[in-house]
Design a protein with these regions (language model features):
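A structural signal for short, hydrophobic/glycine-enriched beta-strand patches
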Residues: 30-183
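Non-catalytic accessory segments flanking enzymatic or RNA/DNA-binding domains
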Residues: 2-5, 131, 190-192
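General helical structural elements
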Residues: 6-10, 68, 186
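Glycine-rich flexible loop motifs, especially short His-Gly-Gly/GGXG/HXGH segments used as catalytic or interaction
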Residues: 180-192
Length: 192
């Protein structure tokens, strides 16, 4: 009896939706293909994250640095821009990221430090010109999944040529899966 009730209710909903045009086939719409992206020399921009009161890096920031370092292995000609001010105990986010990169063997001459930004908007506003001054072909942005959407928008608003996004998973697993798919597709299609 319960099954019949559910089937009948489902049929009524479908009939109602069809009558209103809710189930009519959608008109195919195609976006123009994404313009070819130039990965010849991308800037890898790692966004900061608040430091501990003693000036040390929080786990999320260390993970962002490791993600950026991994990306940099694929682009040996590219600089890494570390961006973040918000000093704690005499250390800026960018300064701590630079130290970690150097400890892990990344060459100092490929690190550009932007240590004035106190927000994601400022990260974008201050890093986009640095990427352009370094003669890069665009930006690969590195942050965390829960921060990615806002960061992408801020960098686009600042005039950044966003080639791809990479994010370290954090937060809600559903968001992580969706963000991973976006990250994987971003070099090939416009996502956003």
């Amino acid at each position: 009896m319960r099954r019949r009730w559910k089937a009948a209710a489902g049929a009524i909903v479908l009939a109602f939706a069809a009558a209103l045009g809710g189930l009519s086939p959608a008109v195919a719409q195609a976006e123009p293909p994404a313009a070819g992206k130039d990965f010849s020399k991308p800037a890898i921009v790692i966004l900061g994250y608040g430091l501990n009161p003693d000036g040390t890096m929080r786990t999320i920031l260390r993970r962002r640095v490791l993600t950026g370092l991994t990306v940099a292995q694929f682009f040996p000609q590219s600089p890494i821009i570390v961006t973040g001010g918000n000093p704690q105990n005499g250390n800026s986010e960018a300064g701590q990221m630079r130290k970690m990169l150097m400890l892990l063997g990344f060459p100092d001459n490929r690190i550009i430090v932007e240590d004035k930004a106190n927000s994601t908007v400022q990260n974008a506003r201050f890093s986009v010109p640095l990427a352009k001054q370094a003669g890069t072909s665009g930006i690969i942005l590195v942050t965390s999944t829960t921060h990615q959407g806002r960061a992408d928008g801020d960098f686009a608003d600042a005039g950044g040529n966003l080639l791809a996004t990479m994010s370290y998973p954090d937060g809600d697993p559903t968001v992580n899966v969706v963000q991973f798919a976006r990250d994987a597709m971003s070099p090939f299609v416009n996502v956003g």
